[in-house]
Design a protein with these regions (language model features):
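Walker A/P-loop
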Residues: 14
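ATP-dependent NMP and nucleoside kinases share a basic, alpha-helical "lid"
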Residues: 90-95, 100-137
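P-loop (Walker A) phosphate-binding loop of NTP-binding proteins
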Residues: 8, 20
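ATP-dependent small-molecule kinase phosphotransfer cores
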Residues: 32, 36-99
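ATP-binding Walker
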Residues: 11
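Small-molecule kinase domains that catalyze NTP-dependent phosphoryl transfer to phosphate-bearing small molecules
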Residues: 90-91, 115-116, 136-186
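Hydrophobic anchor at the beta1->P-loop junction of P-loop NTPases
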Residues: 3-5
Length: 188
């Protein structure tokens, strides 16, 4: 069984993943996979090709790519299509031979891969708590955080009957206990 963990910035995915790891389950992070892929020159060249950049660098020039996709929705879509496919394929490959695996996937609904999962757990949190959480770890301003939240999937309008939702509005230990209870319920 492969279970996705997702939620917006500052919702509490990291805390949820920590609780799941404490239970002894394998967790594969999309962000970690992306970092691994960036070490592969073929992947980096694929990123450049996806956004029509003629470049022979073997390391990703984030500014170059950002400039190429800025205000160009077609190139941004091409970039996301390429990177998301590679990330998901690597995650599912690493999941082979494991009975239960959790995938931490920040952009699950944006990428449209939710149907590939046996179960999806969505972490929800009120916006003010999300802003404070991100502020405390990033140094971003409130406006920058709100802008990022607005650019993410609108979890408030998610069909909550299709997915398991865990609300993170208590303290850390209560939330961790809630996550563990939900995981135990899902896995029977």
């Amino acid at each position: 069984m492969i279970i996705a963990i997702t939620g917006g910035i500052g919702a509490g995915k990291t805390t949820a993943i920590t609780a799941i790891k404490q239970m002894g389950y394998l967790v594969i992070s999309a962000d970690d996979i992306y970092s691994e892929l960036l070490k592969d020159p073929e992947f980096v060249q694929g990123v450049y090709r996806a956004v029509d950049i003629d470049c022979d660098k073997v390391e990703l020039d984030r500014n170059l790519v950002s400039t190429a996709v800025f205000k160009n929705s077609e190139k941004l879509k091409a970039l996301n299509d390429f990177t998301h496919a590679k990330i998901y394929n690597a995650m599912f490959e690493k999941s082979k031979n494991h009975e239960v695996v959790f995938h931490e996937v920040p952009l699950l609904f944006e990428s449209g891969y939710q149907a590939r999962y046996d179960k999806v757990i969505v972490i929800m949190r009120d916006i003010n708590s999300r802003i404070q959480s991100v502020k405390s770890r990033s140094g971003l301003s409130t406006d920058e955080i709100v802008s990022r939240i607005k650019n993410q999937f609108d979890y408030e309008n998610l069909d909550k009957n299709k997915h398991t939702v865990i609300t993170n509005n208590g303290n850390l230990s209560d939330f961790s206990a809630k996550v563990k209870a939900v995981v135990n319920e899902i896995l029977g």
